[in-house]
């Protein structure tokens, strides 16, 4: 019963303890927060990007494991390097997707350009490499979801095995947007409205199409455009 007693004590203290919240303008590391106490960091404005493979379950069920491993490795490597090149902070890998947080004055523009570059990497780098190596009709599809909001983060887990959890609309909506297949890039209207014009228009043509997200009751924007890496 020692474990049960310890857990009851810890859970009780977590629900009754007072939160210490510190404002920050940058993405913290897990070590910046205390693990076993109600300690959080508050980003007043941050933009979250999720890049996710679409159809990976079918791929694993029908393709050789080596093929699937190469798809995972190349997609996540390209997405991660592009995220970092655009100033994003990688905060988590979850199976076939990567999460990143962008801060600063150009966070929405940087995140959107990142998404278009990931699309370019898929179309112009990964897909040609697939065709060169494998005789297959497989088409790599992905979705990048982006939202912006206030975010809080807290440290979760146990000593020696812990990470950060992100609490806020952007973290949830960006992840959920990747569940909407059909378009490689999806952003909320809050992100679109804060984009620099160079990320909205190409030769006077809007690169984004409005689409209502019925489940959440908000407007989003989709794009099939790419931005050369």
From Swiss-Prot:
<dbReference type="GO" id="GO:0035556">
    <property type="term" value="P:intracellular signal transduction"/>
</dbReference>
<feature type="binding site">
    <location>
        <position position="52"/>
    </location>
    <ligand>
        <name>Mn(2+) 2</name>
    </ligand>
</feature>
<comment type="function">
    <text>Pycsar (pyrimidine cyclase system for antiphage resistance) provides immunity against bacteriophage. The pyrimidine cyclase (PycC) synthesizes cyclic nucleotides in response to infection; these serve as specific second messenger signals. The signals activate the adjacent effector, leading to bacterial cell death and abortive phage infection. A clade B Pycsar system.</text>
</comment>
<keyword id="KW-0963">Cytoplasm</keyword>
<dbReference type="GO" id="GO:0005737">
    <property type="term" value="C:cytoplasm"/>
</dbReference>
<keyword id="KW-0479">Metal-binding</keyword>
<dbReference type="InterPro" id="IPR029787">
    <property type="entry name" value="Nucleotide_cyclase"/>
</dbReference>
<dbReference type="GO" id="GO:0000166">
    <property type="term" value="F:nucleotide binding"/>
</dbReference>
<keyword id="KW-0051">Antiviral defense</keyword>
<feature type="binding site">
    <location>
        <position position="96"/>
    </location>
    <ligand>
        <name>Mn(2+) 2</name>
    </ligand>
</feature>
<keyword id="KW-0464">Manganese</keyword>
<feature type="binding site">
    <location>
        <position position="97"/>
    </location>
    <ligand>
        <name>a ribonucleoside 5'-triphosphate</name>
    </ligand>
</feature>
<protein>
    <recommendedName>
        <fullName>Uridylate cyclase</fullName>
        <ecNumber>4.6.1.26</ecNumber>
    </recommendedName>
</protein>
<comment type="function">
    <text>The pyrimidine cyclase gene of a two-gene Pycsar system, generates cyclic UMP (cUMP) from UTP, has little to no activity on ATP, CTP or GTP. Expression of this and adjacent effector BcPycTIR (AC A0A0J5WTU0) probably confers resistance to bacteriophage. The genes are probably only expressed in response to bacteriophage infection.</text>
</comment>
<feature type="binding site">
    <location>
        <position position="96"/>
    </location>
    <ligand>
        <name>Mn(2+) 1</name>
    </ligand>
</feature>
<dbReference type="Pfam" id="PF00211">
    <property type="entry name" value="Guanylate_cyc"/>
</dbReference>
<comment type="subunit">
    <text>Homodimer.</text>
</comment>
<dbReference type="GO" id="GO:0046872">
    <property type="term" value="F:metal ion binding"/>
</dbReference>
<keyword id="KW-0547">Nucleotide-binding</keyword>
<dbReference type="GO" id="GO:0004016">
    <property type="term" value="F:adenylate cyclase activity"/>
</dbReference>
<dbReference type="InterPro" id="IPR001054">
    <property type="entry name" value="A/G_cyclase"/>
</dbReference>
<dbReference type="GO" id="GO:0051607">
    <property type="term" value="P:defense response to virus"/>
</dbReference>
<feature type="domain" description="Guanylate cyclase">
    <location>
        <begin position="47"/>
        <end position="178"/>
    </location>
</feature>
<keyword id="KW-0456">Lyase</keyword>
<dbReference type="GO" id="GO:0009190">
    <property type="term" value="P:cyclic nucleotide biosynthetic process"/>
</dbReference>
<comment type="similarity">
    <text>Belongs to the adenylyl cyclase class-4/guanylyl cyclase family. Pyrimidine cyclase subfamily.</text>
</comment>
<feature type="binding site">
    <location>
        <position position="50"/>
    </location>
    <ligand>
        <name>a ribonucleoside 5'-triphosphate</name>
    </ligand>
</feature>
<feature type="binding site">
    <location>
        <position position="52"/>
    </location>
    <ligand>
        <name>Mn(2+) 1</name>
    </ligand>
</feature>
